[in-house]
A protein has these predicted regions:
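Short glycine- and Lys/Arg-enriched binding-loop motifs that mark or flank ligand-binding interfaces
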Residues: 28, 32, 71, 78, ...
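Short, low-complexity, polar/charged sequence segments that are solvent-exposed and flexible
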Residues: 19-22, 52, 74-77, 123-127
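Phosphate-binding loop/pocket of nucleotide- and phosphate-handling active sites
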Residues: 22-24, 86-146
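Generic beta-strand/beta-sheet core signal
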Residues: 3, 36, 58, 79-81, ...
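Active-site-adjacent helical/loop segments in soluble small-molecule enzymes
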Residues: 39-99
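Exposed alpha-helical structural elements
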Residues: 9, 28, 43, 62, ...
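Glycine-rich phosphate/pyrophosphate-binding loop at beta-loop-alpha junctions
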Residues: 1-50, 111-119
């Protein structure tokens, strides 16, 4: 499971071995995950514990790095929640919670343009182009195949 360290009451309870989800004031670039008092937190804890899963809280810097990693390796520009997912998987793999021989499915459903303002300082400028293949080719300096 994934949680952002600026908003990770479920991960905190997991680390403490507690069933009590203590509300927090969210502070994260991952706005879609900024839920300081998750209604289903206890159920999330139960699922992780009953399946032998793991939880991790990641920093905003790790979120941005997760987004960059996904863009660089898969060509996918995910929103910040997707960056949280990748950063968490990376952390759990480094900690040995996820083993190299395991198959893992990571759901990335939100496009990076949804949260561009949160990562703009880390990603550089964006280009606005006309909605045409020629404009796309020109923006990326791609020559038409003959």
């Amino acid at each position: 499971m994934l949680f952002r360290s600026g908003c990770s009451p479920v991960a905190q309870a997991f680390v403490e071995g507690s069933d009590t989800i203590r509300p927090v004031k969210p502070s994260t670039i991952a706005k879609s995950l900024a839920i300081g008092n998750p209604a289903d937190g206890y159920f999330a804890l139960d699922v992780v514990r009953s399946t032998g899963g793991g939880l991790a809280a990641v920093t905003d810097d790790e979120v941005v790095e997760g987004m960059r990693l996904l863009a660089r390796t898969e060509g996918i520009f995910a929103e910040t929640a997707g960056g949280v997912t990748i950063a968490t998987l990376k952390r759990l793999a480094a900690e040995g919670v996820v083993r190299p021989d395991e198959r893992v499915v990571v759901y990335i459903t939100g496009h990076g343009l949804k949260t561009l303002e949160a990562v703009a300082p880390h990603c550089g400028p964006t280009a606005t182009i006309a909605p045409s293949l020629d404009a796309f080719r020109a923006a990326f300096d791609i020559e038409e195949a003959s």
